Curated annotation (Swiss-Prot):
Disulfide bonds: none
Cofactor: Mg(2+)
Site, Substrate discrimination: residue positions: Y13
Pfam family, one: IMS_HHH
Family to which the UniProt record says this protein belongs: Belongs to the DNA polymerase type-Y family.
Function: Poorly processive, error-prone DNA polymerase involved in untargeted mutagenesis. Copies undamaged DNA at stalled replication forks, which arise in vivo from mismatched or misaligned primer ends. These misaligned primers can be extended by PolIV. Exhibits no 3'-5' exonuclease (proofreading) activity. May be involved in translesional synthesis, in conjunction with the beta clamp from PolIII.
Keywords, alphabetical: Cytoplasm, DNA damage, DNA repair, DNA replication, DNA-binding, DNA-directed DNA polymerase, Magnesium, Metal-binding, Mutator protein, Nucleotidyltransferase, Transferase
Catalytic activity, as annotated: DNA(n) + a 2'-deoxyribonucleoside 5'-triphosphate = DNA(n+1) + diphosphate
Gene3D superfamilies given in the database record: 3.30.70.270, 3.40.1170.60, 5' to 3' exonuclease, C-terminal subdomain, DNA polymerase, Y-family, little finger domain
Active-site residue numbers: E103
Stated name of the protein: DNA polymerase IV
Amino acid sequence: MKKFIHIDMDCFYAAVEMRDNPKLANVPLAIGGNSRRGVLSTANYIAREYGVRSAMSNYHAKQLCPDLVIVPGRMAVYKDVSTQIRAVFSRYTDLIEPLSLDEAYLDVTHSEQCKGSATLIAQQIRADIYNATGLTASAGIAPIKFIAKIASDENKPNGQFVVLPDQVDAFLAQLPLGKIPGVGKVTLEKLNLKGLYTGQDVRKKGVNWMQQHVGNFGVSLYQKCAGEHIGRVSTERVRKSLSVEHTYEYNKNSLQECLEQLPSLLEELTTRLNKQQLQNQVNKLSVKVKFANFVVTSADQAHQQLNSDIFSELLAKAYQRGLQQPVRLLGIGVGIKNQPQHNLQLSILDM
């Protein structure tokens, strides 16, 4: 039987800012750019009570919470704290899969710490993190990987939740499908239209029905709902894509204005590719456009290297779909060849 722990720091960026500036501790706080068109990275729990959420525009957030304090992010500081957190993980297991600066899976199946108890290990890790950083973390513990992630949300903030082996079946049966990683809003709506709302609904349909009506994703979903998808902690990853994007303070009102943004985007993308040593592994170019009405479109083309002319053509193609709508965000990216020799060692700092 496997033992997985999912550790999730509590409103990480905001928590670091509140720790370093006590004046921010009891006010609604968010991390983001200073412009009204900026997008929030995260918000503390006080701000969340007003409906403020990550990925929300500054303008919208201020409408919900006029007293919201927005401070710029300090990524170098967050990375340093993340390194401290990773050091805590390493005391208990070498099987660590970071998902971001503030979140990771741990496989403690064979750990001898805390007499092998995953529950006690999670409790001690959270205490060690607090002692090292002054920050709180929440944890989920389960014999199935994705259940551990779901469980880490159950007692937030600064808590943990355990799903024991003999509780897995009942937990999955009542589980709303929207809580399963990989089931987004659009997918959930399609599943609901087929009468699928919980794990039990999926199990009743059976794997053959799920494949016939939902496709390969339906098979994977059935396996999760049936407790057949145990999962494993992956200590390596293959990067499949790399992209950069900018949200502009003022809308771009013509294709020409958008095209003028390409050189700076291309320079930033080139720098990131070179840093990751992936400049020779490109297999696709892509462009993303978000219009003022928040509709998003993209265009891509197979190509083996960065090419400004192709990016321009793709941008023009995507822009035309907006029917003269102003543009608030532009992004460009590349697909990366799937070659094992370019696997990247997982590092919290890479995510």
